[in-house]
């Protein structure tokens, strides 16, 4: 068996809320229960696999949109569920962990949207990023761009005073595509289409004379962030092309994590954070 296969079984056994335990002992149990090794065989194999599995957990904590496990003690190689409530957590981290327990129902509700609603969802996410002016383009004539928005940096109080004064008149543009493909991965050709559409928009080249992008006010040297949202996932080729071309590509799971961390659609029920479809829909339709 490969370390990745063992990690997958560990994630299922421990779960996102599982308490701390020794990694090697957890691997031993998985090897016996899921791979039918005898106790002595499992003990020897766990010793060989421990470092590799630990490295995979650390890597997923850094790169995965929604890691399942976390390393809680490097000295003894202890592991726990990623959302396990640690007494040392700050109030912000504790709240984020409670919200992340609702990622699955939140993702399912995102996938339940119609393709028109998912384009509106793209514009709504821009508002969560701070954009004040957002718009969804007409579906029949979107010129390869489904949604866009403008963020005025001078309106954001998080900027330090010197930079805030310098950036007062800077307006950051966002433009993107939203593809409702829950089961079909996004390939590099779709990333290429978005890059081409934005390149044409920069030069004011469109297939019609409609002025649907006038609100974007895109000039040759305006800063613009290209975004691609999907309810599903991306192929490795699409992610590679997005990284090389500067496109921010977000899968359905990554979008669900982003919204869960902002408590979208969440409410507190006697200390338990729960997801509510109506609250999510209210958020989607709010201006």
What are the residue ranges of the model-derived segments?
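Mixed-charge (Asp/Glu-Lys/Arg
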Residues: 1-287
């Amino acid at each position: 068996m490969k370390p990745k296969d063992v990690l997958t079984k560990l994630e299922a056994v421990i779960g996102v809320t599982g308490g701390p335990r020794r990694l090697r002992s957890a691997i031993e149990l998985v090897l016996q229960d899921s791979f039918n090794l005898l106790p002595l065989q499992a003990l020897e194999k766990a010793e060989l696999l421990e470092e590799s599995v630990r490295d995979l957990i650390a890597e997923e904590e850094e790169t995965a949109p929604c890691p399942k496990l976390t390393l809680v003690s490097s000295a003894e190689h202890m592991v726990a569920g990623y959302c396990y409530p640690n007494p040392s957590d700050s109030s912000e981290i504790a709240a984020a962990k409670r919200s992340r327990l609702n990622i699955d129902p939140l993702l399912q509700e995102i996938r339940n949207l119609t393709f028109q609603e998912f384009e509106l969802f793209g514009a709504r996410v821009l508002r969560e990023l701070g954009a004040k002016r957002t718009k969804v383009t007409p579906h029949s004539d979107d010129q390869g761009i489904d949604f866009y928005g403008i963020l005025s940096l001078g309106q954001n109080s998080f900027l330090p005073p010197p930079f805030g004064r310098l950036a007062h008149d800077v307006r950051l543009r966002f433009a993107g595509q939203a593809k409702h493909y829950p089961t079909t991965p996004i390939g590099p050709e779709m990333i290429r289409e978005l890059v081409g559409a934005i390149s044409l928009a920069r030069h004011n080249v469109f297939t019609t004379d409609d002025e649907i992008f006038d609100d974007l006010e895109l000039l040759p040297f305006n800063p613009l962030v290209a975004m691609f949202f999907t309810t599903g996932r991306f192929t490795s080729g699409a992610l590679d092309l997005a990284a090389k071309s500067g496109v921010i590509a977000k899968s359905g799971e990554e979008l669900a994590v982003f919204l869960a961390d902002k408590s979208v659609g969440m409410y507190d029920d006697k200390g338990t954070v729960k997801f509510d479809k109506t609250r999510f829909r209210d958020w989607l339709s709010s201006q």
